[in-house]
């Protein structure tokens, strides 16, 4: 393999992959500006002859940090509201309500063509277009995970469903993207420090027959250029239904510096503006690092099980509002298309490059037992970069909880690697190659070998972005 042989020949360049490589000297001919240089590609897939509106990557990232006055108003609210341990109340919902309003403002009106938001700018993460699960060209959605039979409701007998998603970054968060990707050929994670005020919002859509899921009545449908099913790479333009909206907020008041929240679509609310049918599932401000006694189960969701011993997530207890859903491990926050043995924070805390650990313990080649010392490494309150947090593994660089940042850099390096060929000028005086090198230190493993939870083997050989799918047990 090219990657391996290059690695062998130029061992030692690994450490300089994170932009420490000196810029190449300009050379006549070779460094002529290719068309569009300075712009990142917008998407990876669009059918021949498609005449509808297409996705544009919002990529004019702010060069300076935004003014503090632009910090969203909901930062003044207490995200816990009047929540007290063992006694759930609804105060936290005001925070979620305001946070939702902020994400919607101007974006709903612009039909989520966020570069046209008339109130404030929002942006996208570059380098999500590459590879078989990369961005499609209608909405910019990437292929994420499989939706298992019974995952969304006991009536959902359809299998082979899939999730597609697209994330949007406010100007605080986008400033960080711009810093990391300032040099388009040398992404530099040393700039990965999201400032207070950063908000990232992600819409998730499913390809399942909506009539099988009561909460997907009166759905919000988007057309996407999507695969026939999760296992397929053959695409066509088809509708998907909104199921979930995820948010990440950089707020100094939480133990880690990040707050996670999610909303689930419930068409039974029959709200006049269908976007308002996104009801809050909950908020997670910590990872409950002491909660380790495993009482996980993935029954097909007939009721939402709120676990009283979880202290750093609050979950919506209004059963009329929130459709029955599974949560994360031991009741930590997770959404309907997330893995029940994980949590928002536990996956996101692994964001680092080189990628040295899996996003969840059960994906490790030699998985730990639920609740043991090694398992609990995924359930700690790691700090964000501004609070002095380091990488999940020694010798890596933290990406400040942002997984798309990691995947973008990984995709970039794959592309660089796969295009093959070496420029003579890339060889320095010592015979070392001065270019970004693949930096996946962990061996490539066959994901089917790690299939400990009855999770389906991944059909795509290169699917780092996939969220593990849940397997509800009927
Ligand atoms: C199993 C791991 C996993 C879990 C659990 C998980 N995520 Fe993510 N998340 C990902 C991956 C992988 C991506 C990047 C893929 C993409 O969006 O294209 C991502 C992307 C995101 C993004 C876009 C910014 C970023 O970091 O890339 C947001 C916002 C987000 N997730 C929020 C949440 C919230 C809120 C929850 C819990 C309700 C959650 N996530 C649970 C794996 C996970």
Residue ranges and their predicted role:
Residues 19-20, 355:
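Ubiquitous "structural anchor" signal
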Residues 21-25:
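Sec/Tat signal peptide C-region and signal peptidase I cleavage site
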Residues 26-346, 351-474:
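Conserved small-residue
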């Amino acid at each position: 393999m090219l990657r391996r042989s290059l690695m062998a020949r130029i061992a030692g360049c690994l450490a300089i992959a994170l932009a420490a490589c000196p810029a190449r000297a300009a050379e006549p001919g070779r460094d002529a500006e290719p068309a569009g240089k300075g712009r990142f590609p917008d998407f990876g897939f669009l059918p021949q002859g498609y005449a509808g509106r297409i996705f544009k990557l919002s990529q004019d990232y702010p060069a300076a940090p935004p003014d503090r006055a632009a910090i969203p108003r909901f930062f003044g609210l207490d995200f816990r509201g009047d929540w007290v341990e063992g006694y759930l109340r609804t105060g936290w919902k005001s925070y979620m309500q305001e946070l939702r309003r902020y994400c919607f403002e101007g974006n709903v009106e612009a039909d989520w063509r966020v570069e046209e938001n008339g109130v404030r700018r929002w942006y996208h993460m570059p380098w999500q277009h590459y590879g078989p699960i990369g961005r499609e060209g209608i909405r910019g959605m990437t292929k994420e995970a499989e939706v298992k039979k019974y995952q969304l409701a006991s009536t959902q007998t359809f299998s082979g469903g899939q999730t597609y998603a697209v994330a949007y970054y406010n100007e605080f968060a986008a400033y960080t993207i711009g810093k990391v990707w300032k040099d388009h050929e040398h992404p530099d994670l040393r700039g990965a420090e999201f400032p207070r005020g950063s908000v990232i919002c992600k819409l998730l859509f499913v390809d399942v027959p909506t009539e099988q899921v009561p909460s997907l009545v009166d759905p919000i449908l988007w057309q996407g250029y999507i695969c026939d099913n999760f296992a397929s790479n053959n695409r066509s333009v088809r509708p998907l239904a909104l199921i979930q909206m995820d948010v990440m907020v950089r707020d100094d008041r939480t133990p880690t510096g990040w707050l996670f929240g999610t909303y689930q679509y419930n068409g039974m609310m029959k709200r006049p503006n269908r976007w308002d049918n996104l009801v809050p599932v909950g908020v997670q401000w910590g990872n409950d690092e002491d909660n380790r006694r495993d009482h996980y189960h993935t029954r097909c969701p007939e009721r939402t099980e709120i676990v009283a011993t979880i202290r750093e997530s609050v979950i919506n207890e209004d059963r009329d509002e929130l459709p029955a859903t599974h949560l994360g491990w031991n009741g930590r926050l997770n959404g309907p298309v997330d893995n029940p043995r994980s949590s928002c924070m536990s996956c996101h805390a692994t964001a680092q490059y080189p990628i040295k650990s899996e996003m969840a313990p059960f994906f490790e080649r030699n998985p730990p037992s639920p609740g043991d010392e090694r398992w609990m490494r995924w359930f700690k309150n790691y700090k964000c970069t501004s609070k002095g947090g380091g990488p999940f593994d020694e010798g890596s660089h933290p990406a400040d909880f942002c997984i798309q940042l990691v995947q973008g850099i990984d995709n970039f390096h794959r592309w660089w690697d796969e295009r093959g060929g070496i420029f003579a000028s890339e060889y320095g005086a010592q015979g070392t190659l001065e270019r970004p090198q693949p930096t996946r230190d962990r061996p490539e493993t066959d994901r089917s070998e790690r299939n400990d939870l009855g999770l389906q083997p991944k059909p795509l050989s290169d699917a780092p972005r996939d969220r593990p799918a849940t397997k509800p047990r009927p």
